[in-house]
């Protein structure tokens, strides 16, 4: 089966509550505005992404479709600005355990499903993975062209960063390694502690590959109502940050 030709961006995090799904939603809209054909794929059994896109809770998803050996294309839903959304969907505990067992045995599971979507080289897939070390994370890392580690400027994210770096190390050592970025999300420049923590991140990682997204309640408010956060015409540092990050992700992975 031919490999997926689309660029694949995996959003990962060492700990939860960092705004990873929110960021996946916003990046999907932003990259679509740049002319990419974007598919936002939820690879997380928590099944929360439908809330951000204003989709019904019973939207069919990849969990049950995969167990029934059904293709993913027909369950894609319209998202913001013309992008497509493929949610995980509702699953019970037994279904989740069955799927995780399957994924452990078949590391090419995700690659095969992406290949069947028939995406072009102008397409981008944004994968929202669960926090921490899990089978969904490793499936995404097998196919990723870029890996975005999402963190907050706090001690919990800094503590989880070392574990995530260890998890990523084998994938980043491959000949065709993905490019890795760290996005510090929801930075509050009015907080001296947050700025101090950002400095610690910079000392740990260096400037290269470290990006910042400022805190903006308008982003969360828009998503709470199922609205595109980038449709807001008001001046927003966070929206400017996201547009800039979309430009970064739209550039060739080996670009400086």
Locations of the language-model features?
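Active-site catalytic microenvironments for nucleophilic, acid-base chemistry
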Residues: 30-34, 116, 167-170, 248, ...
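Active-site signature of alpha/beta-hydrolase-fold catalytic machinery across serine-
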Residues: 26, 30, 52, 139
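Short, hinge-like loop/turn segments at secondary-structure boundaries
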Residues: 55-60, 167-168, 198-200, 227-230
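Conserved catalytic-core segment of NTP-binding enzymes
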Residues: 34, 39, 119-120, 124-214
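C-terminal lobe/tail of nucleotide-utilizing enzymes
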Residues: 1-6, 174-256
